[in-house]
Amino acid sequence: MVQVQVEFLGGLDVIFSKQRKHQVSVEGANGSVTVGDLIDYIVSNMIQKQKDVSVFLEDNTIRPGILTLINDTDWELEGEKEYVLEDGDIVSFTSTLHGG
């Protein structure tokens, strides 16, 4: 189990009880905990309304237009869903799509 900080920015906080920062404890299936495990946890435990899952996910991964950072580094450079989380990591999701 790891404890990480998860941030929802750029308006994403609306589907997470209007709270931007969350401290979460996540368990992994085989001992280590990946960002994929974190995403599963978020969908199962943190999104209040099932209809809002499509705002966050598309084709079982983070929706295009949402910048995902692990400790301020683009998750694409860290292995995306395969990145193994450690205690104290900060994972942020920022919507880059805004109304005007």
From Swiss-Prot:
PTM annotation (1-thioglycine): residues = 100
Subcellular localization is given as:
Cytoplasm
Q: Give the sites of the cross-link named Glycyl lysine isopeptide (Gly-Lys) (interchain with K-? in acceptor proteins).
A: 100
| UniProt-listed SUPFAM superfamilies | MoaD/ThiS
One Pfam assignment: Urm1
- Output the Gene Ontology terms for molecular function: protein homodimerization activity; protein tag activity; sulfur carrier activity
Tell me which GO cellular component terms the UniProt record holds.
cytosol; nucleus
Q: What main location does UniProt list?
A: cytoplasm
Q: Which UniProt keywords apply?
A: Cytoplasm, Isopeptide bond, tRNA processing, Ubl conjugation pathway
Top-level taxonomic group: Eukaryota
| Post-translational modifications reported in the UniProt record | C-terminal thiocarboxylation occurs in 2 steps, it is first acyl-adenylated (-COAMP) via the hesA/moeB/thiF part of UBA4, then thiocarboxylated (-COSH) via the rhodanese domain of UBA4.
Which processes are annotated in GO (biological process)? cell budding; cellular response to oxidative stress; invasive growth in response to glucose limitation; protein urmylation; tRNA wobble position uridine thiolation
| Pathway assigned to this chain's UniProt record | tRNA modification; 5-methoxycarbonylmethyl-2-thiouridine-tRNA biosynthesis
PANTHER family in the record: RURM1 PROTEIN
What does this gene product do?
A: Acts as a sulfur carrier required for 2-thiolation of mcm(5)S(2)U at tRNA wobble positions of cytosolic tRNA(Lys), tRNA(Glu) and tRNA(Gln). Serves as sulfur donor in tRNA 2-thiolation reaction by being thiocarboxylated (-COSH) at its C-terminus by the MOCS3 homolog UBA4. The sulfur is then transferred to tRNA to form 2-thiolation of mcm(5)S(2)U. Prior mcm(5) tRNA modification by the elongator complex is required for 2-thiolation. Also acts as a ubiquitin-like protein (UBL) that is covalently conjugated via an isopeptide bond to lysine residues of target proteins such as AHP1.
Family listed: Belongs to the URM1 family.
Q: What protein am I looking at?
A: Ubiquitin-related modifier 1
Which organism is this entry from? Eremothecium gossypii (strain ATCC 10895 / CBS 109.51 / FGSC 9923 / NRRL Y-1056) (Yeast)
